[in-house]
């Protein structure tokens, strides 16, 4: 407190104590709370405090009792953090949707340096149960992390290559332990992202098949108890890809599945992924009565990821897309052993 504020506080506090006969008889915790509220009102602009106190005092008696019960089980800070987490996620989804589907913005929304980087910080979009293990690295690093997760201490010297002999760089790999009698079994989700303006077609499906087949054919992966799912993600797909994921005796969206059902490829659109995310958050959104405004959500995304999203308003050239089969990683510049 500044000197003047301290003097004001002392004067007002003295008057409170002398003017309220039963103040000294109150519980010490209540006395501290009241004096703390008084200090906050003097130190800061009173609008925030008035809003908070007004909301609490305006609660129906039943809601006040519910809040009191909650505060006996957790802290107000934890309650606020939980509500903020849901509100932030709803704003994130609305902002991301705008970036992905706005006709002008998506022209300049880059896959590798922007979309990829944002999603690496928000892997909950692909499922709450997963954690990021590989970010924009080679299939060789995927093998290393897969072995590490299951406790295999094996040195990987020879690089993993696709069936055609080329090197592959995966965008994101997420992992989780599968509830199973076999404690070392894991689920791995490999996500291949495409810029929103890129329709999934033959080149893109061939690229992700190359990753899946590399895992399927490399004998070093076979000794690791794991299930593999590959997602190929963009806004839309062309007629070729649509026919590939609409085959008889196979669920729609499945591009390929191994005979042992332990490895498969799914083609996902952002509309499907965003819908699934909102469905998971729907009950919390209803209770929070939170409506994610388009402009406010876009501002939230741009403020949170200001450094990453620089240039999304520019009219410069769009980012050069990766050519399937020609991915390059620093680790792959070293000659094979």
What is the predicted function of each stretch?
Residues 1-337:
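Charged, terminal alpha-helix-loop-beta segments
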């Amino acid at each position: 407190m500044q000197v003047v504020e301290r003097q004001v506080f002392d004067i007002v506090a003295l008057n409170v104590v002398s003017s309220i006969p039963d103040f000294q008889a109150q519980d010490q915790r209540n006395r501290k709370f009241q004096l703390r509220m008084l200090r906050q009102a003097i130190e800061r602009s009173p609008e925030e405090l008035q809003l908070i106190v007004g909301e609490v005092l305006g609660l129906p008696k039943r809601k006040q009792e519910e809040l009191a019960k909650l505060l006996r089980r957790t802290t107000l800070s934890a309650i606020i953090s939980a509500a903020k987490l849901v509100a932030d996620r709803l704003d994130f989804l609305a902002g991301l949707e705008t970036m992905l589907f706005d006709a002008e913005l998506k022209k300049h929304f880059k896959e590798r340096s922007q979309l990829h980087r944002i999603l690496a910080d928000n892997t909950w979009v692909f499922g709450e149960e997963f954690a990021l293990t590989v970010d924009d690295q080679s299939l060789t690093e995927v093998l290393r992390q897969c072995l590490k997760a299951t406790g295999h201490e094996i040195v990987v010297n020879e690089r993993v290559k696709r069936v055609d002999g080329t090197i592959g760089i995966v965008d994101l790999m997420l992992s989780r332990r599968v509830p199973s009698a076999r404690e070392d079994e894991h689920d791995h989700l490999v996500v291949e992202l495409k810029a929103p303006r890129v329709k999934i077609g033959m080149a893109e499906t061939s690229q992700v098949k190359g990753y899946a087949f590399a895992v399927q054919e490399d004998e070093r992966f076979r000794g690791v108890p794991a299930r593999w799912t590959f997602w190929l993600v963009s806004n839309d797909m062309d007629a070729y890809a649509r026919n590939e994921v609409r085959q008889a005796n196979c669920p729609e969206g499945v591009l390929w599945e191994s005979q042992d059902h332990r490895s498969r490829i799914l083609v996902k659109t952002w509309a499907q992924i965003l819908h699934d995310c909102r469905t998971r958050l729907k009950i919390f959104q209803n209770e929070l009565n939170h409506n994610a405004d388009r402009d406010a959500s876009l501002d939230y995304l741009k403020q949170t990821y200001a450094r990453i999203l620089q240039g999304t308003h520019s009219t410069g050239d769009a980012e050069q897309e990766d050519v399937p089969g020609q991915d390059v990683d620093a680790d792959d510049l070293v000659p094979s052993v």
